[in-house]
Amino acid sequence: CKKQRLAILNTFQHLIARVLDTDGLVIAQDADLSDISIDYLKQLASNEIEPWIAINQWQAKQGWDVYFYDRPNPTALIHQLELDLRAGHKCYVTTDSRSGRYGSETIDRYIKQTLKQLEDSYTKTLVVCSHTTNTTGHPAVDFVSSINTQAPAYDAVFVTPTLGTGVSIDIKHFDRVYGILQGVIPDPEVRQALARVRANVPRHLWCAKRGMGTIGSGSNNYRSLADWYQENYKENYALMSPIMRIDVDA
């Protein structure tokens, strides 16, 4: 997506303009709507438009019970996950990475091996990530396509940001939601990921104290950061000018 970003944006602009020029309808949805999204879409239109905006003001009458694990690592949370599965609870586990020490695949392997050794039983689990959902014949493909039908087949489902938005698990199957966040994705995406299961069930959450990414060039010097942002701003403007009709020299 990054490599083809300009081509994607160019195609998107032409599609929006074409639809609006032919009296078509553009329906835009955003779980974290702001003026940035609205202004961007208005700028893509070839003519001035005034969008009709519907805001969902609904709020739950009762909040979630959330258990935060204030520890250096998520081992205590993973132990609680193990106990819940041994007690027969169905668990939905959202992570922000597929591989690594606390990635979805690693935790999935650990849980299956541990429970099999302790109980000599098989816990049916599923990992949903970019790799499994793009593998022909993998159960994750069917899971994503009909999530409310497939969910009851699993004791635990481990997901990455691949399933962080765009789906709604309405069926009452999962008894617990777990979140293991190492600072890879921003907090709005974390909230979205934890809300995929709609039922008001307990949420167990571990978050890293610091994110894994860097800001700008990664420098700790404010002057270096300012210079990087200024240069990056100019480069992006130059790249975007043919698409967004920006006068770079203005």
Identify the function of each model-found stretch.
Residues 85, 123, 130-132, 145-151, ...:
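Long, low-complexity intrinsically disordered regions enriched in Ser/Thr/Pro/Gly
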Residues 48-57, 92, 115-135:
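Conserved RecA-like helicase motor-core motifs
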